[in-house]
From Swiss-Prot:
CDD domains: NTF2. It comes from Emericella nidulans (strain FGSC A4 / ATCC 38163 / CBS 112.46 / NRRL 194 / M139) (Aspergillus nidulans). Facilitates protein transport into the nucleus. Could be part of a multicomponent system of cytosolic factors that assemble at the pore complex during nuclear import. This is Nuclear transport factor 2. Keywords: Cytoplasm, Protein transport, Transport. The lineage of its organism: Eukaryota, Fungi, Dikarya, Ascomycota, Pezizomycotina.
Amino acid sequence: MADFQSIAQQFVTFYYQTFDGNRAGLAPLYRDHSMLTFETSAIQGVAGIIEKLTSLPFQKVQHQVSTLDAQPSGEHGGILVLVTGALLVDEEKNPMNYTQTFQLMPDGAGSYFVLNDVFRLIYNA
């Protein structure tokens, strides 16, 4: 069995570097049956997911990962990944806290794709 923690770390590093630099470049990570829940919007399929991510109302973004937890998931080699962190957008000086969960599945070619992706900002009470 592959080292799920190492795979999760590599995935998260790649995902946020790509998100911060070229959101459209995330398309190969999703499939037509993938689903993204971004705050209150649920989107299925590569085209819809990338349209949502590229239309977010900011130009610059920088993710800072605080925690990363991973577990093997299911009998088909999936990996459940939970990330918490902070992000800065555009010229904002105060970072916003977020949590994001990914369900990664093997693609049959030695890599993984995102089956499920749930993103939520954490607002102070």
